[in-house]
UniProtKB/Swiss-Prot annotation:
InterPro entries: FA_synthesis (IPR003664), Phospholipid_synth_PlsX-like (IPR012281). Belongs to the PlsX family. This is Phosphate acyltransferase. It is found in: Cytoplasm.
Length: 346
């Protein structure tokens, strides 16, 4: 049995999307047990529509719901101990839940997660890791918005954590990792990126294969299993990809409805277009993982639909089932030991 705590008030639509999304996840994974946190007047009527889910779940009342526009400091002051977001995170800390999922305010969720769960040993800053559809299948991209900027040490930690997530999620024994840069040549890029690359080249690692620098177009190609960057660049890349996917879907729709011949052609090609649309749908790959914390927290898109929230829950389910935290902690300990040994020899 895997227990997942849910911030039922998170996102643009709150319980009206969160609970149907959880119900979809429960249908697919009957071994999930949910703990919902939220305002009773809003959560209980929606939960009552799903009797099977309600029977297999627990509801705990909250006093406060964190707004999507609340500043992190404001959210901490107003919501600590009594908001649905805080209580869902705290359930992971106390061991009541194995993972937390929220579609709420990203800044508030990160601030509360850091304050409540603390960081893993030797990790300086957290990263948000996202699952990215590629020509080869899927890749991990991090950081996609936890913090702006990162030094070489932090980028290396991201690489180790991203590889651990790829191993857990994709069941790859030795994931390939690349540092996002403006070119693949070793002389290009910012000093911190070049230094991180040098550290990864010089340190022997069983858990990942460093593939050097990768460029923006390599993300969609699936050149590596995990792409590492800092949060400012990663978030721009994410939003650009999401916007491009929606643009392509709209352009296809317009093209296929322009003439009678195009409409007839669409009838025969509908299956292929539906598969393409599904692969490009952000809801199908929803769920950013907060890496570097001493507990599993999953961030769903605030505007996700029920299918999208279900995807975020499934990411949390897979992270728990594949023992993500234990693997990442072991990888980081091994890396820091190996790097200190290499540094002492230099």
């Amino acid at each position: 049995m895997i227990k997942i705590s849910i911030d039922a008030m998170g996102g643009d639509f709150g319980p009206e999307v969160v609970i149907p999304g959880a119900a979809k996840a429960f249908e697919r994974h009957p071994d999930i047990r949910f703990i919902f946190f939220g305002l009773p007047a809003q959560v209980e009527p929606v939960l009552a529509r799903y009797p099977k889910l309600k029977e297999a779940s627990e509801f705990r009342a909250s006093e406060v719901a964190i707004g999507m526009d609340d500043k992190p400091s404001q959210a901490l002051r107003a919501g600590r101990g009594k908001s649905s977001m805080w209580q869902a995170i705290e359930a992971v800390k106390t061991g009541d839940a194995d993972a937390c999922v929220s579609a709420g305010n990203t800044g508030a969720l990160m601030a509360m997660s850091k304050f409540c769960l603390r960081m893993m040993s030797d990790v300086e800053r957290p990263a948000i890791a996202g699952i990215w559809p590629t020509l080869r299948g899927e890749s991990i991209v991090l950081d996609i918005g936890a913090t702006i900027g990162a030094d070489a040490r932090q980028l290396v930690d991201y690489a180790v954590m991203g590889a651990g997530m790829a191993r857990a999620l994709f069941e790859v024994r030795k994931p390939t990792v690349g540092l996002l840069n403006v070119g693949t040549e070793e002389v290009k890029g910012l000093d911190e990126i070049k230094e991180a690359g040098q550290i990864l080249r010089d340190t022997p690692l069983d858990g990942l294969e460093y593939s050097g620098f990768v460029e923006g177009n390599d993300i969609g190609k699936g050149t590596v299993d995990a792409v590492v960057t800092e949060g400012f660049t990663g978030n721009i890349a994410l939003k650009t990809a999401e916007g491009t996917a929606r643009q392509m879907a709209e352009l296809l729709r317009q093209a296929m409805s322009r003439t009678l011949l195009a409409k007839i052609g669409y009838v025969f090609a509908k299956g292929a277009f539906d598969r393409l649309r599904e692969k490009m749908d952000p809801n199908k790959v929803n769920g950013g993982v907060f890496l570097g914390l001493s507990g599993i927290v999953i961030k769903s898109h605030g505007g996700a639909n029920a299918e999208g929230f279900c995807s975020a829950v499934e990411v949390g389910y897979d992270m728990v089932r594949n023992r993500l935290l234990e693997k990442i902690e072991a990888d980081l300990a091994h890396f820091h030991h190996s790097h200190s040994h290499v540094s002492s020899k230099a």
